């Protein structure tokens, strides 16, 4: 009888855990820009996207420190090796890590604290292409669409401007004040540069400690759409 009870308990636990299991998230990445971009994802790789094209990736639950971005001004050979003006990742079409600055980032971590996904748009690495990030969930606890669609490149401060993009102050000067490192790690605040970026894109991270107005959540198991220029 004890064995029967134990088997019943194990079976019940198995059903419970199966119900808690969170599936991989699907990310549909679409280019609505009037020019070609080379989408990059870590994890995920990379894909050339002409205007109107979509690339779909699957990302495992529990993935952290993940990001999606657009590369511009790229040229790759038949083996997938080449260079990009912005967002380049070690000269590879299929990215195996993070890209070079400047690049507008869609960042996320899946199935974290309280079974939530955390997602944001970041300008901490600067800006190259407008983008939006939209969860598919209709859960009222899900923030919904976030976007950075301003034409920052045309308004970029002259000392941050580079071909095809606009660097952040941290990327340009690499000082504790702008990067929130060293003695400034726990005390740094907005600067004139970060206020410029925040004014252009209020929902995006403008510097490393800009969490309060820039991090959003959805229930785990949500799928997402990332759209460049839309």
From Swiss-Prot:
Intrachain S-S bonds: 33-229, 74-84, 89-95, 142-218, 148-201, 156-166, 170-179, 180-188
Gene3D superfamilies: Thaumatin
Keywords of this entry: Allergen, Disulfide bond, Pathogenesis-related protein, Plant defense, Signal, Stress response
InterPro entries linked: Osmotin/thaumatin-like_sf, Thaumatin, Thaumatin_CS
Transmembrane domains' residue ranges: none
Record-level GO BP terms: defense response; response to arachidonate
Tissue: Strongly expressed in female and male strobili, and, to a lower extent, in cotyledons, leaves and pollen grains.
Cited SUPFAM superfamilies: Osmotin, thaumatin-like protein
Inducers of expression: Weakly induced by arachidonic acid.
Function, in words: May be involved in disease resistance.
PANTHER family, alphabetized: OS03G0233200 PROTEIN (PTHR31048)
Entry's family note: Belongs to the thaumatin family.
Protein name from the UniProt record: Pathogenesis-related thaumatin-like protein 3.3
Annotated organism of origin: Cryptomeria japonica (Japanese cedar)
